[in-house]
Amino acid sequence: LSLSEEDALKAQIFGCWSIPLGLPYNENLLVRIKLKLKPDGSVIKSEILDHARMNKPGQGFYKVLAESALRAIQLCQPLRVPTTGYDRWKDLQLNFDAREMLEG
């Protein structure tokens, strides 16, 4: 995806994302998600790339944050994807930074 296409996709998902309250701002609030998409923008698979972090001590907030990002992807289906170039965007990695969204 081009940068503008990726930004548009993230903006769509951000619109569906209810970020949990009470996040520790001094922590890394980045969630990396790998997506596999159908040509119509439906999600075949979504996977948290930092899955091991979800079960580390003191990272309970990350599990809640990551699960909320996955829910946003499910709620926003089908994603608005380009009508051409399926091979370029059928497998994507998107970075969701809660701090970026909260700070505007």
Give the residues covered by each predicted segment.
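Short amphipathic alpha-helical segments at helix-loop
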Residues: 1, 54-57
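Intrinsic-disorder/low-complexity signature in envelope-associated proteins
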Residues: 1-18, 22-23
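Soluble non-cytosolic domains of exported or imported proteins
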Residues: 3-7, 60-67
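Conserved "boundary/linchpin" sites in short secondary-structure elements
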Residues: 11-18, 34-55, 70-104
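A generic structural signal for short coil/turn motifs at secondary-structure boundaries
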Residues: 22, 57-58
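Short loop/turn motifs at secondary-structure junctions and domain boundaries
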Residues: 24-28
